[in-house]
């Protein structure tokens, strides 16, 4: 499951759990992006990685990969999937993403190659229409509506509002300890 996870929240965890259950996946690997080319302002990759580790620690089916944050320069999904394919040769790869991200997929680096590397699971998000992409390598899944977004969590912290129950408790504590999101970008 690729994402910025800035910060990771309960919506991400519910989606991962639901996809793992529906597609009988042995493991869901969370892959925090290193330096996403489409987003200018993101928190330090190691903070986002550690928050993902904290958030997923209690679920044996979840793990977190450093693959993108250890790569120098911009991180692209196609490079991540190629590297995962090399590491997990005999495994079927499923790439979990939101329908909002899928709508931009044709602008991604080597977009035509993506379909041969993994089966895509596009999860609907409140306020984002499902895109019509004819491809037998995409499954669309509606997950119980959880109107939580990372950008809203960051804005709440910046405004001094609580994020309890939106993100896991350990992540709330990590954000407070490291003073994340207090300034426009911190």
UniProtKB/Swiss-Prot annotation:
Presence of the UniProt keyword Transcription regulation in the record: no
Keyword set includes Nucleotide-binding: yes
Pathway: Cofactor biosynthesis; NAD(+) biosynthesis; deamido-NAD(+) from nicotinate D-ribonucleotide: step 1/1
Enzyme class label: transferase
Domain of life: Bacteria
EC number: 2.7.7.18
Gene3D superfamilies in the cross-refs: HUPs
InterPro entries assigned to the protein according to its UniProt record, in alphabetical order: Cyt_trans-like (IPR004821), NadD/NMNAT (IPR005248), Rossmann-like_a/b/a_fold (IPR014729)
GO molecular function: ATP binding; nicotinate-nucleotide adenylyltransferase activity
Alphabetic keyword roster: ATP-binding, NAD, Nucleotide-binding, Nucleotidyltransferase, Pyridine nucleotide biosynthesis, Transferase
Catalytic activity: nicotinate beta-D-ribonucleotide + ATP + H(+) = deamido-NAD(+) + diphosphate
Classification via Pfam families: CTP_transf_like
GO biological process: NAD biosynthetic process
Function: Catalyzes the reversible adenylation of nicotinate mononucleotide (NaMN) to nicotinic acid adenine dinucleotide (NaAD).
Family: Belongs to the NadD family.
Protein name, entry field: Probable nicotinate-nucleotide adenylyltransferase
Name of the coding gene: nadD
């Amino acid at each position: 499951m690729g994402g910025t996870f800035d910060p990771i929240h309960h919506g991400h965890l519910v989606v991962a759990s639901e996809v793992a259950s529906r597609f009988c996946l042995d493991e869901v690997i969370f892959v925090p992006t290193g330096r996403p080319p489409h987003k200018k302002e993101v928190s330090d990759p190691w903070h986002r990685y550690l928050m993902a580790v904290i958030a997923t620690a209690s679920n044996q089916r979840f793990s977190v990969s450093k693959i993108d944050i250890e790569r120098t320069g911009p991180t692209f999904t196609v490079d991540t999937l190629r590297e995962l394919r090399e590491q997990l040769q005999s495994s079927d790869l499923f790439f979990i993403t939101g329908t909002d991200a899928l709508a931009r997929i044709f602008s991604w680096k080597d977009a035509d190659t993506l379909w041969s590397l993994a089966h895509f699971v596009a999860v609907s998000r409140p306020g984002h229409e499902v895109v019509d992409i004819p491809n037998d390598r995409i499954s669309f899944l509606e997950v119980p509506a959880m109107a939580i977004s990372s950008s809203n969590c960051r804005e709440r912290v910046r405004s001094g509002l609580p994020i309890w129950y939106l993100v896991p408790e350990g992540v709330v504590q990590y954000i407070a300890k490291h003073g994340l999101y207090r300034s426009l970008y911190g």
